[in-house]
Amino acid sequence: MLAVIFFVLTQFTGMREDLFLALAQINALVAEGEWWRIFTPILLHDGIMHILFNMWALWVLGPQIERGVGTWPFVGVYLASAAVGGAFAYVFGSPQDVAVGASGAIFGLFGVWLNWAVRRRNTVQGQMLLRQIGFLLLLNAALPFLIPNIAWEAHLGGLIAGFVIGEMWSRTKDERARVAVTIAVAGLAVATVLIL
């Protein structure tokens, strides 16, 4: 919902430039210590198709994860995946890169689903889910070759974070422990950015 509000503000008010300067992941500013910029790009989207795709993916992927693990772990995986995606975009991207969007967070949700599919691969449902998720991931892997300025590093980082968090969640049913896992993963992303 916040992303939609910020999209309206950037598209229909004179605040676009100010909000992008304040919240976009500008790697040169991350290098100067503005580590929070690995989180804040999830509030910004560069165009109607960008936000529509991300909000559609959130709507499709999110509710079952939230029902399965609880609201706070879901919020945690979303933010932790955004942070790891941002850290990947910082570490593997160019110092001149500027990134906006929630794709790292969305790919974290793909990562959780991929983990669930891999864990259930010996069932018919798991095999079908694995094929569906695999197809969507292959399609998304091709996008950077077709559409310029896609932060594939953020996609990859988010996917890995979501998969790892999903694996760690499978080891506990305790909601507080699941939240702690997401905080630890986000903390590692921040520490990586601060160290490098």
Residue spans of the language-model regions?
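A detector for small-residue-rich transmembrane helices and their helix-helix packing motifs
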Residues: 1-196
